[in-house]
UniProtKB/Swiss-Prot annotation:
Catalytic center residues: H718, T720, H797, T799
Name of the protein described by the UniProt record: Protein VP3
Region (N7-methyltransferase activity): 171-245, 429-555
Localization (cell): Virion
Protein family per UniProt: Belongs to the rotavirus VP3 family.
Keywords noted in UniProt: GTP-binding, Host-virus interaction, Hydrolase, Inhibition of host innate immune response by virus, Methyltransferase, mRNA capping, mRNA processing, Multifunctional enzyme, Nucleotide-binding, Nucleotidyltransferase, RNA-binding, S-adenosyl-L-methionine, Transferase, Viral immunoevasion, Virion
Subunit annotation: Interacts with VP1. Interacts with VP2.
Taxonomic path: Viruses, Riboviria, Orthornavirae, Duplornaviricota, Resentoviricetes
Region described as GTase/RTPase activity: 556-692
Pfam families: Rotavirus_VP3 (PF06929)
Major subcellular location class: virion
One annotated GO biological process: viral process
InterPro entries in UniProt: VP3_Rotav (IPR011181)
Amino acid sequence: MKVLALRRSVAQVYADTQIYTHDETKDDYENAFLISNLTTHNILYLNYSVKTLQILNKSGIAAVEIQKMDELFTLIRCNFTYDYIEDIVYLHDYSYYTNNEIRTDQHWVTKTNIENYLLPGWKLTYVGYNGNDTRGHYNFSFKCQNAATDDDAIIEYIYSNELDFQNFILKKIKERMTTSLPIARLSNRVFRDKLFKTLVSDYSKVVNVGPRNESMFTFLDHPSIKQFSNGPYLVKDTIKLKQERWLGKRLSQFDIGQYKNMLNVLTTLYQYYDMYHEKPIIYMVGSAPSYWIHDVRQYSNLKFETWDPLDTPYSDLHHKELFYISDVTKLKDNSILYVDIRTDRESIDWKTWRKIVEEQTINNLNIAYRYLSTGKAKVCCVKMTAMDLELPISAKLLHHPTTEIRSEFYLIMDIWDSKNIKRFIPKGVLYSYINNIITENVFIQQPFKLKTLRNEYVVALYALSNDFNNREDVIKLVNNQKNALITVRINNTFKDEPKVGFKDIYDWTFLPTDFETNESIITSYDGCLGMFGLSISLASKPTGNNHLFILSGTNKYFKLDQFANHMSISRRSHQIRFSESATSYSGYIFRDLSNNNFNLIGTNVENSVSGHVYNALIYYRYNYSFDLKRWIYLHSTNKASIEGGRYYEHAPIELIYACRSAREFARLQDDLTVLRYSNEIENYINKVYSITYADDPNYFIGIKFKNIPYEYDVKVPHLTFGVLNISDSMVPDVIAILKKFKSELFRMDITTSYTYMLSDEIYVANVSGVLSTYFKLYNAFYKEQITFGQSRMFIPHITLSFSDKKVVRIDSTRLNIDFIYLRKIKGDTVFDMAE
């Protein structure tokens, strides 16, 4: 949902939009909670409170102040990610299709012939890093830019088996117009940028597990971050290949040679970062015009020095000349070298050309060896061709996508590789490598071992759920890693499947109860965003590919009402019960009935079950930003930090009742996952709370009334307001608590309206209006370790007779308290108090 804050109402009517006017009788937190549970996508928030907006944004719900009508029109028609610290709105708005354009934030694409293959009458527009160049389009009171591009489709095309780009991009645009927006993927780049800038400033050592190409710009300015990936393809790995011949295959209709060069250089750069943790000088020989340097410059201040007879406009220092092996002495330490020398074929016959290429390959290799033979802190990437070669067995082979697969590949070596054992590799084996293997990632660092790192902050986004990881090892890492942000795939199957298919692999599935964490926040993507100064207009949908975000070691752990809080916890319930269910009271009714409380009078205001816990369990697929386990734990230890607002703390027994209701719901729905989750949450409640039951009581609290509107034959009709199992020495403690609650007890609005047979021979009158105070009293006794209440649900009633009587119904009648007392069962009254 998105909240657009206005000082005055607007005349226009918008689809899927609701107006909420700030309620001055409620505090900012209560207003935020009410807004978050509205069911429409757009909320126009009138007479807004800035504090309420802040609460929503911290909860991951985008809430933006609107000053002008064009701001409202822009934000209401599309989704966006909001940096609420810097006041920047990143639109994810594809309405630019109506201008017959596709967009890119990679400059090199604009220098290709891609426009020849677009839809008729369409053009390509460059919009800069995260749409930065579009800021001029929006003259708003907040900074605004459109981060939507078609780079995802362009890159997917490059790696696909499709050659016809026009058909491919048409299909992708149609998909985009007919399916739900993959909002997490679109906002992820904004999030990653913010995340790693924050972590690098807060932690001396940061480890990142499983980065993919979409992160290749994110880490350019963070050489200190240790990357773990799937490992490189080494020269020695070619021993598994059979010999093949030249295949020749076109991968792309438009020229992607620059993309290949960029990937080669970035792969080399990240190898250097992995070894030396600092920025090198980047030397490049050949590969002009290298327009992609402009893209790199948007993210980092890396220095480029280049040699090529053709211009390289974005180089810091360009030598418009050929580079010879004797020029290697000009290259400094703490550098990387990219050698991409290849003479244009022009009209040379094939045999002569082949001979020239092989000579240049040997020359390129010699330049690399010469460069690596002296000095320190050097990594080289060199252009090779398929031919009989001796190569170091530990050198890394690269074959990033290029316009046509022919006979070229690339080799990365460091100083140690260049001196390592060399192996003869036949031309046919290298053709086999070229024909069958595409390097899919610029990150080729070693795989991560699932072991706790003592001094590092570990980030593993979408990297550990794969079933080639041992599931128990993943759980152990999450439990034991002190500082981390780790995601795992949430189990939102209905049959409690331990693993599910995803693309061509399988992922383990997890629930929050799979982890034993006492200082971690377990939330959703949008809940996580709120902790890093971001919010989002479209919450995660239960697609089957959703992830838990587990943050360990965060200083926000105790801030229970600020982050990963209960905002939106009833939203799914509202959507269902106000549109599909038998009554809008269905949730209240079901919760009472499933706990054998059949008095449904006033059930919506006096419910005996925690609605928060119940909704968090049965609708966990729709809102798992609320960290239920943390909420339970911090209340059980009395460590919850509440910033403000009216805050109701549930008695532990209310939580147990909620689990029982959720279990009943799961059985009716045949939802095995919710069934397990409810059982495990109940077990967790019993683990962190020391709940004892007065099932063999020796004291009780009684309430005697001035008026009983029914006939009775018991000596003193009264309401048993709870039973206790205590020693006589604890009686003063009980009395002290009763005195503390005196005012609240006598303020209870107690009513009765019918009689019924509680069981054979027990005739009783119903009592309403006491449950809220009962549970508060329960909490007070619990905190003093006084056993109060039984394991079965407390059903307030007044015993009238121990014989069969006819049921009576009357108008709701108020019962006035005469006095409240504490009495020993089969003993004397030890305390009483009147108003």
